[in-house]
UniProtKB/Swiss-Prot annotation:
Pfam entry (one): PAPS_reduct
GO molecular function: ATP binding; sulfate adenylyltransferase (ATP) activity
Reported function: With CysN forms the ATP sulfurylase (ATPS) that catalyzes the adenylation of sulfate producing adenosine 5'-phosphosulfate (APS) and diphosphate, the first enzymatic step in sulfur assimilation pathway. APS synthesis involves the formation of a high-energy phosphoric-sulfuric acid anhydride bond driven by GTP hydrolysis by CysN coupled to ATP hydrolysis by CysD.
SUPFAM superfamilies: Adenine nucleotide alpha hydrolases-like
Listed EC numbers: 2.7.7.4
Organism: Pectobacterium carotovorum subsp. carotovorum (strain PC1)
UniProt protein name: Sulfate adenylyltransferase subunit 2
Subunit structure: Heterodimer composed of CysD, the smaller subunit, and CysN.
Family stated for the protein in its record: Belongs to the PAPS reductase family. CysD subfamily.
Classification via PANTHER family: SULFATE ADENYLYLTRANSFERASE SUBUNIT 2
Amino acid sequence: MDEKRLTHLRQLEAESIHIIREVAAEFSNPVMMYSIGKDSSVMLHLARKAFYPGSLPFPLLHVDTGWKFREMYEFRDRTAKAYGCELLVHRNPQGEALGINPFVHGSAKHTDIMKTEGLKQALDKYGFDAAFGGARRDEEKSRAKERIYSFRDRFHRWDPKNQRPELWHNYNGQINKGESIRVFPLSNWTELDIWQYIYLENIDIVPLYLAAPRPVLERDGMLLMVDDDRIDLQPGEVIEQRMVRFRTLGCWPLTGAVASEAQTLPEIIEEMLVSTTSERQGRVIDRDQAGSMELKKRQGYF
């Protein structure tokens, strides 16, 4: 294939499909992490293209905290059924028994127990030796320095000083028993690339990405959408209907919306063309402390 004849989106598509096929051929038990967001939707679309007309040679895994938006759960189940994918859902049973939640225990503890520990439990339970993730280098500085094949030790830890060279399109997937690789096929994509590709390929996404009147309250400089009756209202807080959408999706008490009138994909793309902030500004977990994402990744987070 002559890459010079491809548009930049088709070049990114070809690179991602190549990576996905390499992992499927090289590893004995891969899995695709499915967080239900826009990047997961693009990654799943690319995987289906990579093996069309066959089915995916690996399952999808959703590490569930119990605090995702209701529309995300509906979209997850509908998508898995429509595409005939094997969907594995894991919740940390110890965290559930302790009633861990973001309101009482805070974002750092909630994320560590329900997401990081939950992820490690699931990877160990099923014995996965490679796990696809939808992270991109433009999202956040610790992800910017991570390889496409991200080596993890037997405790699932990431050491940024112990990474393997990736020359051209050659990836080193050699691991010992108990070790694993996190694979990021979308590493070289930007947020704008993602939206342009979603528009180009008509990929289905969670409606929360499109602007609509939603019940929100202001807290710590963020707009939190009230998704169910578990909200812990603080003195002076008022729930009001505002026109908002989400640039990133996670646990609803930890994910901020943005004021927006973008109700269509072209309107979202127009917003991205003039945006000067990262989509991660809407994630409370990224504000826990300086370098919080890198610390979480060192402990086993995606």
